[in-house]
From Swiss-Prot:
This is Ribonuclease Y. Residues 374-467 form the HD domain. Residues 248-311 form the KH domain. GO terms for molecular function: RNA binding; RNA endonuclease activity. Belongs to the RNase Y family. PANTHER family: RIBONUCLEASE Y. Keywords: Cell membrane, Endonuclease, Hydrolase, Membrane, Nuclease, RNA-binding, Transmembrane, Transmembrane helix. It is found in: Cell membrane. It is a single-pass membrane protein. Its main location: membrane.
């Protein structure tokens, strides 16, 4: 039984008792002697009344129950809403706490990583400092050894000078004796005897001086060459330079041979427009699916190649479109050139160079000297000079700066005309470069003396970069003319029987007439020939001069 049924029964029982009592109170006789029996009508009325009361009670109970139920539902709903709200807030709080914990964990992890990174950085710095300290100690020991060597050289030179002085005294004594002997013989006049003695003494002194000079020079060369090779080897072993290749043509692949006719155009209008705007020659031959771009200017070739590739990809090839594409590519290449210069400056860690020089530095990438890319050559010179400066304790940054800019005039020398050194000096002054850079621009072609030690390193690095095997190449005609000119210069000296340029012009062997040239004169000739070659011939790298004097004595056994 549910609660409603129980309530209805209780209400019905109560109503019945109440009605019965009312009925009994109204119908009771004053003093009856017998128990009256209610009539059916009365019972029917009581029953009807009871049913009404029960019905009203039931309705009231339903209303009360409904209100109680609604109130209970409302309370439950509010409780559920509050519970959901509390649960949601609790979940949000949990999520927030989780996020906070994760964030804290992440921060702690980042801090730990930063601390570890700093520790590793400090360890590397400490190792570098220890290594640098060892290098400095090693360098200090080497310098001390070098100082001791210098002191020994000075002692040897002083000893040689004393020997030379003693020899001069002996010569003077010999002159006096010969003069007395000549006067005694009286066959010559005093003046003639004096001239004869002077001639003999000069020859003897010249021979002795040449011998002494050779000994001192060979010793100094040997020691200096050892130190120089050591420094140069340390600098150059860290480079991987490129081999020069002389390209004057570039090829562009075509989707099909049909494009050759479209590139030529009606009556050749397209190809003429393209060649006029780009300054190159388009070679269209029987080679399948290939067009060749020919020009001695690398920048023009690159612009023409890019423009032609865009025209082929676009498919619209006519004079107006060609002009539009070529102009667009030229504008893009100006920015590309500046970007190349900027990247080069940052690669060499020269951030304080005036941005106005970026364009000229980038333009060196499209210039060549003896088929060697000028920008790559300048970077190579900068690296070698900087490394040698570090080895010698000089300003490595200044050496790299001067090395990079020593050929900056070549960027526009073909446009303005004139010497690239003068143009380079003008650019360096315009953009506020230091005096050492200007000195390097002039001194590497010996137009002015070297005034800074870093500039001397730049000149040496320039010679190394140009002289290494594979660095530069010449055209065949220029190469042959240079070898012929080299042999002509050598043959112009008196006593030279023949001359042979070998090793691709990097060595010349001089055969002298032994009857006209003595050993001492051959030695002096080996000094004079290189000077004249430097004055009259323009050549890459260096040329070794070998003077050969051969004496043959032939006899026959009979």
């Amino acid at each position: 039984m549910d609660v409603l049924s129980i309530l209805l029964i209780l209400v019905a029982v109560g109503v019945g008792i109440f009605v019965g009592r009312q009925f009994l109170g109204q119908k009771q006789a004053p003093a009856p002697t017998y128990q009256p029996v209610p009539s059916p009508q009365i019972l029917e009325e009581a029953k009807s009344k009871a049913e009404e009361i029960i019905k009203e009670a039931k309705e009231k109970a339903e209303v009360i129950l409904k209100e109680a139920k609604e109130s209970a539902e409302k309370i439950v709903r509010e409780a559920e809403e509050k519970a959901e709200k509390l649960i949601r807030e609790a979940k949000e709080e949990v999520e927030r706490i989780k996020e906070e914990v994760e964030r804290r964990k992440k921060e702690l992890k980042e801090r730990e990583e930063n601390v570890l990174a700093k520790e590793r950085h400090l360890d590397r710095r400490w190792e570098a400092l220890e290594k640098r300290e060892e290098e400095l100690l090693h360098r200090e020991r080497e310098l001390k050894d070098f100082e001791r060597s210098l002191e020994r050289w000075r002692d040897e030179i002083r000893h040689k000078e004393e020997e030379l002085k003693h020899m001069k005294e002996e010569v003077e004594e010999l002159k006096k004796k010969e003069l007395e002997e000549l006067q005694r013989i009286a066959k010559l006049t005093l003046e003639e005897a004096r001239q004869e003695i002077i001639k003999k003494v000069e020859e003897e002194a010249k021979k002795d001086a040449v011998k002494l000079m050779k000994v001192i020079e060979e010793d100094a060369k040997r020691r200096a060459e050892f130190e120089a090779k050591k420094i140069i080897a340390t600098a150059t072993q860290r480079l991987a330079p490129q081999i020069a290749v002389n390209y004057t043509t570039t090829t562009v692949e075509l989707p099909s041979n049909e494009f050759k006719g479209r590139i030529i155009g009606r009556e050749g209008r397209n190809i003429r427009t393209f060649e006029i705007l780009t300054g190159v020659d388009l070679i269209i031959d029987d080679t399948p699916d290939i067009v060749t771009i020919s020009s001695f200017d690398p920048l023009r070739r690159e612009i023409a190649k890019e423009a032609l590739q865009r025209l082929i990809a676009d498919g619209r090839i006519h004079p107006a479109r060609i002009e539009e594409v070529v102009d667009e590519v030229k504008r893009e290449f100006d920015e590309k050139i500046r970007k190349i210069g900027e990247e080069t400056v940052y690669e060499l860690d020269l951030h304080d160079i005036n941005p106005g020089l970026y364009y000229y530095i980038g333009k060196l990438y499209f210039r060549t000297s003896y088929s060697q890319n000028v920008l790559l050559h300048s970077k190579e010179v900068a690296y070698i000079a900087g490394l040698m400066a570090e080895e010698l304790g000089l300003d490595a940054k200044l050496a790299r700066r001067a090395g990079l800019l020593h050929d900056i005039g070549k960027a526009i020398s073909h446009e303005l005309g004139g010497s690239h050194t003068d143009i380079g000096v003008e650019l360096a002054r315009k953009y506020g470069e230091p005096d050492a850079v200007i000195n390097a621009i002039r001194a590497h072609h010996e137009e002015e003396p070297v005034r800074y030690p870093e500039v001397a390193l730049v000149c040496a690095a320039d010679a190394l970069s140009a002289a290494r095997p594979g660095a530069r190449r010449e055209t065949l005609e220029a190469y042959i003319r240079r070898l012929e000119k080299l042999e002509e210069i050598v043959k112009s000296f008196k006593g030279v029987a023949n001359a042979y340029a070998v090793q691709a012009g990097r060595e010349v062997r001089v055969i002298v007439n032994p009857e006209e040239i003595s050993d001492e004169e051959a030695y002096l000739l080996s000094k004079e020939i290189p000077k004249k070659i430097e004055e009259e011939l323009d050549f890459p790298g260096q040329i070794k001069v070998v003077v050969i004097r051969e004496t043959r004595h032939v006899e026959y056994a009979k």
